[in-house]
Every structure is written in C-alpha cells, then in structure tokens.
Amino acid sequence: MSQHVGHGRRPRTPGPPVRSIRPFKSSEQYLEAMKEDLAEWLRDLYGLDIDADNFLRVLETGLVLCRHANTVTEAALAFLAEAPERAQKIPMPQAGVFCNGAAQPGTFQARDNISNFIQWCRKEMGIQEVLMFETEDLVLRKNVKSVVLCLLELGRRAWRFGVAAPALVHLEEEIDEELRRDLALPSPDPPPPIPPARRPCHFHNLDQMVQSLVSHCTCPVQFSMVKISEGKYRVGDSNTLIFIRILRSHVMVRVGGGWDTLGHYLDKHDPCRCTSLSHKPGSFLKPPGPPVQHEVKVQDGPSQPQPTMTISRSQSPLPPVDWKTYTSSSRKLRPPTPSSPGLRSEPPVRARTLREDPLPRSQEKPTPSQRMSSPGPQFSSTCRGPDLQSTLSGKRANRCPGEPPRGRTPTLWVHKEAGSRGTHTKAPTPQRLQIPEATSKRTSARGPSPPPRSSSLASPHMIWVLHQGASPQLSEPMTVHSSSPGKGLTKIPIRLSPARPPTPGRSSLGTEGEYSTGRGSISSRALEGNLDRSTHGHHSVEASGDHQTDIQTTSETEDPRSLGTQKWKERHTSLALGRRREQALYDNLKEEVVANMKLLEVGTAYTQGTRSQAIPRSGVYVPSLGGRWPEPGGPYDKVIRELVQGPPPLLKVDLKAWKVGSECLPRPIVDPGSPKEKLGSRETGTRIKASLNAEDTTVRTVSPARGQGCSTPPVSANLEAPTRSCSDPSSDKASVCLGKGKRTLRKPQKIPSIYKLKLRPRIRPRRDHRPEKRPSRIPKPLPYSCLVLARTAPGSRLLKATLGGKGGVPCQVNGTGKKEEEKKKGGSNISLESSIQPAESQEPLKLGGTPLSPEEESWV
C-alpha cells in the first residue's frame, strides 16, 4: 500500500527544507532581515501563518502573490476615484491577475500563477527588470534575492495609493525626509502618505549596538565611525555618511537604493575585516574571542602575583595589520623581582601600566621546534604559572633587518635569567638593533629568518666589548653585520647601563642547576667567549648599522689598551664557583679579547705604500686560529705584470676562408714574439709544425724537444688549401685535416632521422608451454634471404683502409683487392706522428690502430 502511494502520479508536498546548523554568511544577513520584514507585512495584511523560515514555501504556489496583486489593483482603482489629479502622476495598475486556486506546489498550475504575477508586475506596475525574478527563482529557489527585492519594490509603489508597506519602506521615507530637511530640498509633487508611528524597540540603544558590532575587530586602530546625529554616522577616513536603523534584531544600513546589515557593510569596507576571516562576527571558522585588551600591567611586590601580560588577539592567517601604538622613548620596563623564597625582593612598588605591541600572529602558537632546549627564557604567548609573556612587534618582524621601526627609539631586549624563568627588560642603545632571536637551535621564535644571519651562531670566535661601569646584569651577546653579504657575522656582547642603579639584593643565576642562588649576581657565564665552553645558548641580538660604522662598532667601542686597566672583578659572592676557576675564566677571556682586537687592527700595521694586501674594506673579518694575512706578492705579481704589459698580439684571419668545413681548419698559433710570462701559464702540449699543400694531403707534425727553454717559432699554416680540400663535395680523395692532439668526438654533417632507422623491437618468446599454441616452425622463404643478402652486399665496404698499430701498414679488411682500391681512392700515403681526426668522407677509425668491426659502429 505504501509503495502504491509512493509511486502515485500526483507529487507530494515537499516538507520543510533541511536547515544547516552552520550560521549563514554575512552576505545573507540582509536577506534574512528582509524576509522577516516581508513575512510580517503579509501576515498583517492577510492573516497568514508565515515567517522567515516558511516564507518561500508559502509563496511557491503563487496564490498569495496573485491575491496581493488583485488587492493592489483594487486599492489603485479606489485611489483613482478619490483623487484623480494625484492619480495621473503615479503609474497605477488597471487590471488584475487570473489565479488558479487549486494549484499545488511544484505543478504547472503553480508555475502559471507565478508567471501571471510576474507579467502583471512588468506590465501594470512598471517594475524594472533589475528587480524582477523568474519562475525558476521561486519554484527551485535559484535566486531568492530577486524575489525579495521584487516584493519590496512592489510594497514601495503600492504604498503611494494607500496599501500598507513593509517597515523598511517606512524607514526609507524617514531617511528621505531627513535628507530633504538637511539639504533644503522641496517635497515631492505627490506628497507621500505619512508613515505610521514606529513602535519602540526593546533592544539596547542604537549607539551601543553599533559599538558592539564595530568592536568585533580586535585591532588597536579600528574602523572609525563618528556619530553625526541620531542614526547618522561618518565612516572611515572619507566623508561618507551612512544612515543606520534598527529593524527588529538587525542593525540595518541604508546603502544606495537598498538596505544592508551593518555587519556585512563593515566586512566589505573595513580594511582589517577584508583581509581577516577571524574579525567577522559571522565566521564559522571559530567562535568570536573575548574583547581585546591591550593594557600590560606589571606589579612588583612580595605579596603580589607574578607579573602577567594579558593580550587577547584573534588568530588570522593573513599578514598583520599596520600597528599604530605610540609610546614614549623614555618609558622603560624595569626587570620585575621574582617572588621566590630563595631570592630577595624589593619593597612593594605601585603597578605601572605600559602600552605594549601585540603579539605577531606567527608567535601566538609556538611550535615545539621554536622552544629552547635549555632552561633559559622562552618566548611564549601562553601564560603558564608565573611566567611573563614576551611580546614582539609584528610590524618590525616584517621589516628589513637593518631598518628600525619608525617613530620609536631603537631598543634592545636584554634577558635576565632567574632560575627556570625568563624575565625580559628593555633598555635603549645607540646602535640600531633588532628583536633578539630566542633560539638555541638557530631558529627564530617569531618566524623564519634569513639563513646567512642565523649561520653566525656557529662562528668559532666571538669578540666581547665591555663598557666601563656597566652592570653585569645587563649583558648580552650582539651580532654585528658586515656590509658584504658573503662575510660571516661576529657576536659582540655589549653591557648596557641599566635604567636605574642595580639592586644589590637581586640575583641573576641562570645556569643548568649546578650553581646555587646567592646574594650577588654572577655574569661570568654570560661572558664566555667560545660556543664549546658556554653552558647554555645565548639569545643573540642582531645589530645592523651603516656600512661605514660596521668596523667602528667593534674596533672603536673600546680601546684594547684600556682593557688591562678595566675593573674586571665585580662585587659579588659565589657559593659554588671557586676563586681560582673564576680568575682563570677572566684571564682566558681577557687574553681572547686582546687577541681578537689585535687581529681586527692588523690593517693599521702596514704602511700606506703597500697596496697589494688583501684586507677587507668593510665588515668584520675574524680569521681562523693560527691564520695570518697573506703575504704581499705571490701569484698576484704575474697577473699584475700581464695586465701592465697589455694583451698579446692576435693573428689576422681571412674571414672569406671560413666556410662550411671550418671544423677541419687548424687552430691558429700565438705569435712567437710573445714570451711565456705574457701567457701566464705553463706549456703542457707540444708545438705542431704543419705544412699543407693543395696537391698533396700529407700531414707532418714535428714536436720540438721538451727541454728547450724558449718556444720554437712555428710555421704559419696556409688556410685556403685545407678549406678547398675539406669543403669540396666533388672530390673523391680522402682528405685528412689537422686536429687537436686531444681525442674529441666529431659532429656528423647530417644527423639521420630516427624514423629512417629501422629499429625492430625485440619480441620475447611465448612462455605458455601449450602444445597447440607453440610458435610456428615454418622456415623463412628463400626470397626473403635473397633480399637480405642483396641489402648487405653494398654495405660490405664499411672499412676501406686502416693504419697498423706499429709500422703504419694498412690492414686488408675485405680481401686482397682492398689495398689497390685504397690506392685508387686515397692517392697518397698517410704518415701520422700525432693523433689524426678522420675526414667526414672516410669511415671511422680507431686511434689505437685496430680496425673497428661493423658491430661496434653506431650513430653519434
């Protein structure tokens, strides 16, 4: 029974469409608001059970549309009878619409009703084609937007002669009236009817709703919206004015001739929302985060919790926005005091608030590879216990390494190690510095860094420059860049004077746990020179200055003569580190600093008259252990003398003699007047003395004695004779030209086509071993074998003449008559004392003297 009903001819009424649990995009919000308004409008007019969910399902039969068309026609005829003068200025319908009341959804009767309504809107109401829809748009839900816009335009036109209009039409009339008052425009000739009084909205104030929508963007510099009057705002950097109204639960914006939601309007015009999916409130990627907090509060005191930094930012896959956070260059963060029982703490100090740059998007979720393996400070945005979150500017991360942020004083982050925690302080430096790279594995914590800069961590030498009177708590290695990208980098730790006098009660012990905490501060482990002696990895600070000040950063920061008189021992108490070990460490450090500074000043030891020394012009160059500067002279003198004497003279070559057979020409020899010093290289080959005649093709090569000190003047070769012998195609003689002593492959004159080579694939025999399917044993026919012999007969003359390996006696390949045939064709004896390159008309020969078999021949 159920099968019979399921296969009936009459289609069943489709149920409600399945709604997605995912929230709709912001571009569909204004359609939902308009459908709610139109559904309420039709419910008030005809008492229908209609809302935004079943709006299209109620209209798909066309009955409600045709009924409304007939109602508008009746109201227009009544208005024409009451005010004929006003009716003449307004386009009014004259006829109604025929409707089939028995139409069911999806049938042709329903399509006919919708088609009749569309024709009535075009003919009687004069609605533009831009606002019209087709039958398929409503029946198959192809274009819901056109259906909504058409009904809204019909409500605007019908409202002129007394038909109730949707609430959006009334809001439009209010805005138009306000514009006419502001611009002092005359009222329209047929005055529009007075809109009904608006019901008070039970939602929040309009300004609060606008502020709530704008605050979805978590950037410090948000899209500006300035209130001009009630419901009127100026947006962005331009003078664009928008009108905002509240329609039920939606904040609508009057845009052009239609409406849009404020959220969708901001998504299209706010530059931050245009480039970020997380700033859109309707994004289904993740729920919106908490409101942004950009204040950083630091509290010092024994009873206060550890300093925390609260920065809530939304994740975004695209590049960060240009931050505009203005801070004074004199404001600094002093290192907070850890509240551990083993360390002293200062008296409570009032909490200070400092505006900090938000975290870059690439640093909010650190990967395990970005964290340090040592117990030093970590760069992490997640607050774990009492750890302090470090913030790095996303704007400076995208800049060039040598470019400081504009409008701010260049600052240097100096790290102070305290146990397993890492607290970071900020102090200004005169150099142009960058954000430190918080890695011990040569990977940056805030994203990828240039490979040449990260390679400087493995340099065997580090030059340490110490400022006098500096606190040992604020010391950090710094990487000095050279102007040449090919040179390496050199770490230079610079002691910076703190923002205030150091506290005696503070200690800064940051090793691997082998030393206990005490009253003083030990900075000797932060001053170890070589990487193999360091107990933990340091954070390097890249300092890039001008090209002229690169060397001055290392050589002029501190005079090496004053290093001996510098006060090396600080007032501190070490419980685990002995005096001997500490003194040895300082002595080694002092010797290393002096040695490195002497290496850097090696350029000043030479006089100005010596110009051939290879001292780098820019950058910092640190040679390896035991390395010295190259002595002046050496192999460079030969090159300089060769350049001073000028280029050697060249032979004049007749260009007309160079033709197609130019491959067979002998190489021209340098003029005998040039000595070996001009060439700058040793003689590795032998001089060839060649004489070529037009009648005789004999080639003689004479190699002089290798023990001679001077070069033998060779005889200039005639270039015209071999050209004629090599390029003449009518000559049948075997022409042999002079070639190099080096064995080279000759290039064939004509490369055969691969299609002309009869390549037959090798067929594997059958392996099925079935007696009835064995290959045929029929012998080959006799004509086939005769054809094979006839084809191979002309090819038997493959090798005509070859030279013997010892005495140069020609070998007989194809019988005794080959020697006479060779004499007829060659016409001359060939004697070679060097390697010979065969002519193109001859068959290939082996240089060793053994003939080539036909199987060894192959195409080049």
UniProtKB/Swiss-Prot annotation:
Compositionally biased residues, Basic and acidic residues: 347-364, 530-549
Biased composition (Basic residues): 1-12, 758-768
Gene expressing this chain: Gas2l2
GO biological process: microtubule bundle formation; negative regulation of microtubule depolymerization; positive regulation of G protein-coupled receptor signaling pathway; protein localization to microtubule plus-end; regulation of cilium beat frequency involved in ciliary motility
UniProt protein name: GAS2-like protein 2
Organism whose genome encodes this protein: Mus musculus (Mouse)
InterPro entries, per the entry: CH_dom (IPR001715), CH_dom_sf (IPR036872), GAR_dom (IPR003108), GAR_dom_sf (IPR036534)
Protein family: Belongs to the GAS2 family.
Polar residues compositional bias, start-end: 301-316, 365-393, 473-485, 724-733, 828-840
Chain intervals for the UniProt region annotation (Disordered): 1-22, 281-459, 473-574, 697-743, 758-781, 801-860
Summary of the tissues where the protein is detected: Expressed in tracheal epithelial cells (at protein level).
